[in-house]
Amino acid sequence: MSITKEKKTELITRYGGAATNTGLPEVEIAIMTERINNLTEHLKVHKKDNHTRSGLLKLVGKRKRLLNYLTKVDVLRYRKIIAELNIRK
């Protein structure tokens, strides 16, 4: 379950400001959060899909590392992205 190209560009412009700011931590976290939400919905239906579950756990770990990096760089940006995406930390 991947996200569509339109949804991805929408997330990039919302959290990156411009369509070319794809490397910002906020943009990457937003895209990962969207993918995590899609995979979570998939796993609610397909409970025994262990391959997807392991991919989901890897994705959550990557997002966690990016959030830790953002905490070290700028705490205000971290708090803002946590509040906007409803991520618990």
UniProtKB/Swiss-Prot annotation:
It comes from the Bacteria. GO terms for cellular component: cytosolic small ribosomal subunit. One of its GO terms (biological process) is translation. InterPro entries: Ribosomal_uS15, Ribosomal_uS15_bac-type, uS15_NS1_RNA-bd_sf. One of the primary rRNA binding proteins, it binds directly to 16S rRNA where it helps nucleate assembly of the platform of the 30S subunit by binding and bridging several RNA helices of the 16S rRNA. Part of the 30S ribosomal subunit. Forms a bridge to the 50S subunit in the 70S ribosome, contacting the 23S rRNA. HAMAP family: Ribosomal_uS15_B (MF_01343_B). Belongs to the universal ribosomal protein uS15 family. This is Small ribosomal subunit protein uS15.
